[in-house]
Design a protein with these regions (language model features):
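Short amphipathic alpha-helical/adjacent loop interface patches that line ligand
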Residues: 13, 28
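A short, surface-exposed loop/turn module that caps and links secondary-structure elements
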Residues: 29-54
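Residues in soluble alpha-helical coiled-coils and helical-bundle/repeat scaffolds
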Residues: 15-18, 36
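Enriched for short, Lys/Arg-rich terminal
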Residues: 2-4, 11, 18, 22, ...
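Basic nucleic-acid-binding interfaces
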Residues: 4-8, 14, 43-50
Length: 86
C-alpha cells in the first residue's frame, strides 16, 4: 500500500520528539507489511466513519483511513488529543 500524508499529519509529525518520529516510521513499516500486526493494535475509532487508529507507543497514536490501495494518514500525537480529533 501507499501512504498519503494530510497537511495536519505533517504538521503534527513535525512537532513530535525524535524518538517518537522513529517509532512512527517503524509503525508505518509494520502497517505496510501487515495491517493487523499485533503490536499496532489497529481498530476502528468508535463514532467515526472508516477512521482507524494504530498504536505508535504507549503514549502515541496515529489515525488513518484506508481508501483503495492507500493509507491516508490523518493525525499523530499523544493518545487522548489524537483520538478526540482523529
Amino acid at each position: 500500500m501507499n501512504f498519503i500524508e494530510t497537511a495536519r499529519f505533517r504538521r503534527a509529525y513535525k512537532t513530535l520528539p525524535e524518538d517518537a518520529k522513529l517509532r512512527v516510521k517503524d509503525t508505518l513499516r509494520k502497517l505496510d507489511e501487515n495491517f493487523r500486526h499485533p503490536s499496532l493494535q489497529v481498530k476502528k475509532i468508535k463514532g467515526t466513519k472508516d477512521i482507524w487508529e494504530a498504536r505508535v507507543s504507549l503514549d502515541y497514536r496515529m489515525t488513518f483511513q484506508v481508501v483503495r490501495n492507500y493509507f491516508i494518514l490523518r493525525n499523530v500525537g499523544h493518545h487522548d488529543p489524537t483520538l478526540r480529533n482523529p
